[in-house]
Amino acid sequence: MSQVQIADIYNPLVFAGAEQEAQIELNAFLSSGVMVEDPRLTAMASVGGNIGELPFFKPLGTEEPNYSNDVTGDTSTPNKITTAIMRYRLASQNNSWSTMDLAADLALQDPAGAITGRVGQYWATALERRLIQSTMGILASNVANDGGDMVVNIATDASSTITDAELVSNDAILDAQQTAGDHQSGFSAIAMHSVVYSRLRKQQLIDFVRDADNNTLFSTYGNLRVVVDDSLSAVAGSNRVTYTTVIFGNGSVVSGMGRTTTPSELDRDPEKGNGGGQSTLYSRRADIVHPLGFQFTSDSVAGQSATLAELSTAANWERVWERKNIPICFLQTNG
């Protein structure tokens, strides 16, 4: 039996659909409800341009209402319903893999499914990292510009032994949620480094629930779905590591995937391998990942798309919603 070649199984339309389905299924922030697709962003991502605006209505306020009376000369003055915008930035991304990279998958019983699964996993991880670095950017902006009113930081870089007061705990997580005041009931998921997750497990604060729809087992902390990701910030100081845990509400991050001219293609180089030939699979995406309540200012972006480092830069973010209306908070601990 001859070996399957990537050209034998590659169909651009089928591949694009299967790869997108795989990345959605494998993205922990999508499956937890933290990130949701916004049809407006998907449409905007397909029309071209790197920067766009997402309009929103400002809250009506909480001022005391008028009191009705029977005086014909008394009239009420209507308040204005005002709008504002959140600016976002599109990320045009691509990557490629050679036949040698995919050789193991080509030998499997379902090579097409194996390859699209691997590429889908790659893009799921890439989008998760864009989400995480965006939240690190709004954390940095919050500390720099808004007095850190979204973060509780109990970590230190002291040379002494770490105390319980500097470690994650039930009280510390509740304190972080309290930064949202009476809006804290909107929190639905908590993302943490595996070191923090392990400590909560040792305290027997993590439960496991099986999804009735797809029989998937997932972790919960109280009423919060748990996402464990070691790409969350773990900054080593002179003496200690500071871990950042992020608590989200449902749909606190919106996303959109635009249509690229050629989402994927296969290129054949017959001269490679001293004439043996090599096939290269290219995958391209146009994505928007945007935390609600903030605008991306692009004040410190060098290229057409923001890199992960630029997403985490405080100067590139500005809060445009009131703190209580943003279902995101942060907890920084030494473990």
Model-derived regions: residue spans:
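Short alpha-helical segments and helix-capping/turn motifs at coil-helix boundaries
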Residues: V34-L41, L174-A176, S264-L266
